[in-house]
Amino acid sequence: MKNFSLWCDFIENSFLDNEFLNLLSHGINGATSNPAIFKNAILNSPIYKDKILKLKEKKTKDIYEELAISDIQKAADKLAPLFYQKNDGFISIEIDPRLHDNTTLSLGEAKRLYSAIGKENIMIKIPATKASYEVMYELMKNGISVNATLIFSLEQSQKCFEALNAGLVEFRKNNIALKEQNTRTPQAVISIFVSRFDRLLNPKAKEQNRIGILNANLAYNNIYSKNEPNIRALFASTGVKGDDLPKDYYIKELLFENSVNTAPLDAIEAFKGKMHFKKPLMNFEIYTELNQIISQSEREKACNDLLSDGLEQFCIAFEDILKAL
């Protein structure tokens, strides 16, 4: 399919040396991480115990960052051939989620992490809050690729695009001799969360497991219509809880061109060999169906609640790691 990319929403040190290599050989083109993923890896995998003991004299956040950066560097190296050959192959790392309402601290942390990792195929994950749009702009302006995350509303996706695109324009303006300098243009993804909508609104909806798909389709249409190939829609939160849906449901239903889907391992396994293009619905079709399923006020409230909950969950996961270390 034209410009569709499937990423793995998981990272763990030993996994990167084994199963991850198999996934790359079967068409996986990137990976994502978040505080919850690192929490599960660091606290549950024995491979980190010796490393933690060797770092015990350091501050807890420094220990976390050293572990996380090591894994991100390893993933970046595994993905490097895809990055240099196909302009894909990114791995994402999120800034400290507790900084989401502070522009200055978020920007400083993002630049520091990018420098510490020292790999070109890194995307810095920035939550889409009011304080963060300026961060996205500054990073793209300075040639640092961005994963704008925790997007639930059309308004968020539009503001992310505006910030990212403005930074991209400035980057290009400041790098007129781009080819001579051998400088790569930064890329961005706008991560639209999908299944969380359905889990929240299914009890109130007249049709099950459709709101997340329709909402994501709407944001995708907005991003795709801008015709900027360096800024793509990414579908996140595409895992299925329970047995009422196929594990790859949120991959198959959002198989759109020039998009990315980052999925958990069970969804990727279920999806193997099913690359069938899906035609996105047009906006009027989306709104017609959405309005039959649930009210606009319920959708708007859900967007706000899900953003608040997502920020809180990542902050709690981050705090849990630090407490355990």
UniProtKB/Swiss-Prot annotation:
SUPFAM superfamilies: Aldolase (SSF51569). It is an enzyme of class 2 (transferase). The keyword Lipid biosynthesis does not apply. It comes from the Bacteria. Its EC number is 2.2.1.2. It catalyses: D-sedoheptulose 7-phosphate + D-glyceraldehyde 3-phosphate = D-erythrose 4-phosphate + beta-D-fructose 6-phosphate. One of its GO terms (biological process) is carbohydrate metabolic process. Pathway: Carbohydrate degradation; pentose phosphate pathway; D-glyceraldehyde 3-phosphate and beta-D-fructose 6-phosphate from D-ribose 5-phosphate and D-xylulose 5-phosphate (non-oxidative stage): step 2/3. GO terms for molecular function: transaldolase activity. Gene3D superfamilies: Aldolase class I. The active site is at residue 125. Keywords: Cytoplasm, Pentose shunt, Schiff base, Transferase. It is found in: Cytoplasm. GO terms for cellular component: cytoplasm. The keyword Cytoplasm applies. Belongs to the transaldolase family. Type 2 subfamily. Transaldolase is important for the balance of metabolites in the pentose-phosphate pathway. This is Transaldolase.
